[in-house]
């Protein structure tokens, strides 16, 4: 049987994916009922409340968070220069913004939202169970000597390609937990080094992301007092990401950008295993319903969410199943199989997915530097082509026409997911590579 035949993928889509051709796929399942296990409005409110009541604790632990009072928040930057630079025939309509999660303090990436939320939920649970905190206790008590001594009896473990490990590792170690991060072969050396300087135990694996996660899961299962942060299925991570929706809504309101039937919101999100974009989309759908149109961006070598959404929902599928190799410079997106939790929710809520090759990643990275003054890591630039796909491709224009959307009235938010902690020499290397490829022919459409 040919590779991919059993996945129930459209033959034309399968051929595009197997050829590594950048592709826009529109989700025919958008609007279907949510699964029974979908988070509730109370779950979303609880997550937001947790991050707010722990803000003082975070500000005490990390000087970088004191200017925000400990709140995990990033700027919304207008991207008019990027819009003006879009080539003829591509997206020129609507208002463009970049959501700067690359600038989130401490962890330097979108993973701070989910990772911090899960660690804080664990710390609260342990502290309350042992009489160290109650419902009304100032959460700065979780940094006390007594709390740290209690946390030191517990291990926090996670598998990661890099950024989630940084997020979990930075906060868990700061609270006194023994912290172990299993990192895949894709993880960058500087991320491992940064964790080790914080006293985090880094376990390196020769395999991919899924193998690192599985190794961590199996080790944690045999250890007492060990909490495994499961990036493939954690509701706490998912809910932490979802809290970004209210933050974005407030920023759009301040910018005078309404979101309603006449003024749709398009959100373009880099996607690895799916938890971060899935959570953000879930939060935005809770606020705006059908007026938000979310597209996830994946490497051509690793479109795990696209493969899962476009195929049979009943069976987990991997990019290896269609003959792809999961090898990309976008280390944070080098994931072969989607989170079952995120995929089930994105199936009902995502408008679609598009793929980007490594040449495009570096072209977008250079555009971010030259047009907006933003230094990103390659995976964080994956979604920069989103507005062009919507207004500059046949499939994108068909999507707009089918919904009666006026492109000029739309707001596009491109999520930048990481880069502020990347060492300067790495940024120079990224940009030199991007300039070299531009000199020999550019990145294509």
UniProtKB/Swiss-Prot annotation:
Which sequence ranges form a coiled-coil region, renumbered to this chain?
Answer: none
Tell me if Lyase is a UniProt keyword of this record.
yes
Supply one GO molecular-function term.
hydro-lyase activity
Q: Mind listing the UniProt keywords for this protein, alphabetically?
A: Lyase, Pyridoxal phosphate
Q: Which reactions are catalysed by this chain?
A: D-serine = pyruvate + NH4(+)
By its UniProt entry, which InterPro entries does this protein fall under? D_Ser_am_lyase, Ser/Thr_Dehydratase, TrpB-like_PALP, TrpB-like_PALP_sf
UniProt cofactor(s):
pyridoxal 5'-phosphate
Q: Give the GO terms filed under biological process for this record.
A: D-serine catabolic process; isoleucine biosynthetic process
Keyword S-adenosyl-L-methionine attributed: no
Enzyme Commission no: 4.3.1.18
- Which is an annotated Pfam family here? PALP
Q: List residues modified as N6-(pyridoxal phosphate)lysine.
A: 111
Give the protein family. Answer: Belongs to the serine/threonine dehydratase family. DsdA subfamily.
The protein here is known as Probable D-serine dehydratase
């Amino acid at each position: 049987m040919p590779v991919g035949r059993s996945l129930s993928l459209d033959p034309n889509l399968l051929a595009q994916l197997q050829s590594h051709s950048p592709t826009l796929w529109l989700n025919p399942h958008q609007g279907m009922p949510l699964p029974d296990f979908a988070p509730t409005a109370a779950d979303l409110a609880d997550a937001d409340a947790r991050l707010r009541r722990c803000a003082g604790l975070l500000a005490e632990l990390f000087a970088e968070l004191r200017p925000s009072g400990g709140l995990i928040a990033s700027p919304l930057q207008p991207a008019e220069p990027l819009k003006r630079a879009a080539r003829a025939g591509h997206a020129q309509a609507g208002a463009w913004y970049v959501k700067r999660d690359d600038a989130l303090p401490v962890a330097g990436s979108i993973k701070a939202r989910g990772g911090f939320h899960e660690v804080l939920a664990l710390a609260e649970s342990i502290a309350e169970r042992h009489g160290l905190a109650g419902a009304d206790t100032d959460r700065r008590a979780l940094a006390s000597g007594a709390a740290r001594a209690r946390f030191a009896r517990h291990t926090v473990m996670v598998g990661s390609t890099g950024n989630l490990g940084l997020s979990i590792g930075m906060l868990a170690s700061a609270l006194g937990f023994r912290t172990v991060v299993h990192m895949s072969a894709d993880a960058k050396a500087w991320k491992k080094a940064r964790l080790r300087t914080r006293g985090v135990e880094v376990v390196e694996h020769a395999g991919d992301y899924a193998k690192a996660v599985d190794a961590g899961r199996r080790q944690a299962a045999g250890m007492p007092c060990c909490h495994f942060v499961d990036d493939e299925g954690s509701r706490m991570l998912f809910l932490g990401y979802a809290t970004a929706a209210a933050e974005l809504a407030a920023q759009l309101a301040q910018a005078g950008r309404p979101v309603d039937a006449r003024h749709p919101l398009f959100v373009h999100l880099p996607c690895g295993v799916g938890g971060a974009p899935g959570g953000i989309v879930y939060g935005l759908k809770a606020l705006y319903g059908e007026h938000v149109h979310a597209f996830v961006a994946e490497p051509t070598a690793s479109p795990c969410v696209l493969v899962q959404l476009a195929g049979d929902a009943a069976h987990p599928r991997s990019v290896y199943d269609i003959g792809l190799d999961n090898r990309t410079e976008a280390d944070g997106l080098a994931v072969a199989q989607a989170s079952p939790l995120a995929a089930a929710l994105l199936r009902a809520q995502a408008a679609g997915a598009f793929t980007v090759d490594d040449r495009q990643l570096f072209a977008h990275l250079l555009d971010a530097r030259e047009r907006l003054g933003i230094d990103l890591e390659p995976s964080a630039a994956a979604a920069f082509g989103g507005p062009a796909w919507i207004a500059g491709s046949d499939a994108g224009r068909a999507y707009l026409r089918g919904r009666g959307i006026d492109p000029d009235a739309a707001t596009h938010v491109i999520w930048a997911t990481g880069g502020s902690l990347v060492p300067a020499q790495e940024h120079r290397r990224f940009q030199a590579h991007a300039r070299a490829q531009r000199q020999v022919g550019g990145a294509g459409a």
